[in-house]
Amino acid sequence: MKTAHTIVVFGGDYCGPEVMKEGLKVLSEIERQNPDVKLELIHHLVGGAAWDVHGENITTAALSDATSASAVLLGAVGGPKWAKHAIPVEWGLGRLRKALDAFGNLRPVNFAAPSLISRSSLKPKVCTGTEILIVRELTGGVYFGPRSEHDGSFDQASDTDVYTRKEIERVTRLAGSLAMARDPPLAVTSLDKANVLAACGRLWRGVVSEVMAAEFPEIELRHMLIDSAAMVMALNPTKLNGVVLASNMFGDIISDQASAIPGSIGLLPSASLCSIPERGQESSRIRGLYEPIHGSAPDIAGKGIVNPIGMILSVAMMCRLSLDMGAAATSIEAAVRDTLEVGICTPDIGGTASTSEVGDAVVAALVRIFDKH
C-alpha cells in the first residue's frame, strides 16, 4: 500500500507561481523515484491572487484544506498591485499561519554549493563553513502584544512585548529536538536582551535555561545578547554554528541579516512548523508551511530570471520534516549542489540560466543521482 501525503499548494503573487512551478517539478520527480509514495496536490489562492478572484485574502476552504494536509507549500504573497487595500493582502499569510498554529520558523543559513562562497557579502575566510539553523518563535512577543497607535499627532505610540512561559518552552523544545537530530548534537545559542528587557530578556533566558537543563542536558547551551549576536554574525558567523534560538522580533531581524551571507536571498528556504519532531529523528511527519524567504519580487516577476533554489530547497525541507522522506531531501540538496557547481544558475548569483532552466537542471541531476543508486 502506498503512503499518501496531501500537500496544499499556494502559488501566491507575482514571482510566486514561477518558483512554485520549479518546486513542483522537483516534487514530481521525487514521487516518480518513490513508487510507494502518493502525493496529492491541492491548489489554492492566497494574498492578492485570492483577493482578485474571491474578494478575500484567503478562503475558508483553503484554510480548511491546509489544516488537514500533511504540509503546505507557498510561493510568495503581496505586491504593489494591492498596496492600497484597506486590508493588506499579506494578512492572508498571517491567517494561514494562525490556522495552522505554526509557532516555530526555521531558516537554514549555509552555502547550497561551495561555488557560492565567492558570492557572499563576507570574505571567504570569514564565511566558509557557516552552518546555522535559526529557530524563531512566531506567536508571541512585541508583534502580538497590546499596542497603542498615535492619535494623528505623532506624539506617542506604544507596542508591548509579552511572552508566556508556555510559548518559550515550546519553541525551546523545538530548538532542542532539532539540535538532537544531529550526531553529535548541535550547540544551541539563545539570543535575548536580558540586561535590559523583561519578556524577551530575563524571562526568555530563564525559561530557556530551565528547559534545556531539564530536557536536553546533552546539548551545549550558550546565551548571547542580540546586539552582540548581530556583530558576530557580520564578523565571524561560524561562531554561531548550530541552532540559534530567538524571540519573534529578534529572530526576524537576525535571520534577515544572516540571509546576506549565502549571496542571494533567492537561495534560502524556510519552514514554519506546527509541532515538534520526535527527539533525535532526522526526518519526521509533522505539519509545516514551507516557502522561500524572498518576497514576490514584482520588479523581476514574469521575466524568467527569478531564482527558484529557495523554493526547491523548501521542498527538500518539507520532504524531511513533514513527509518523513529524509533520503529524498538529501537527494534534492545534492542535486541543487551539482547544478550550481556546474554554473547553471540565475543572474542574481552570476549566471545566465532562466528560472525554468535551473529547475530542469535540478530535476536532471536528481535523475542522475537516482540512477547511480
Swiss-Prot record:
Positions of NADP(+) binding: 77-79, 284-289
- SMART domains, A to Z: Iso_dh (SM01329)
Q: Answer whether the UniProt record assigns the keyword Transcription regulation to this protein.
A: no
E.C. no:
1.1.1.85
Instruction: Kindly list the positions annotated as binding substrate.
Output: 97, 136
Instruction: Locate the site labelled Critical for catalysis.
Output: 143, 193
This entry carries the following GO cellular component terms, namely: cytosol
Q: Which cofactor does it need?
A: Mg(2+); Mn(2+)
Annotated family: Belongs to the isocitrate and isopropylmalate dehydrogenases family.
| SUBUNIT field | Homodimer.
Name this polypeptide is given: 3-isopropylmalate dehydrogenase AMT6
Origin species, per record, is Alternaria alternata (Alternaria rot fungus)
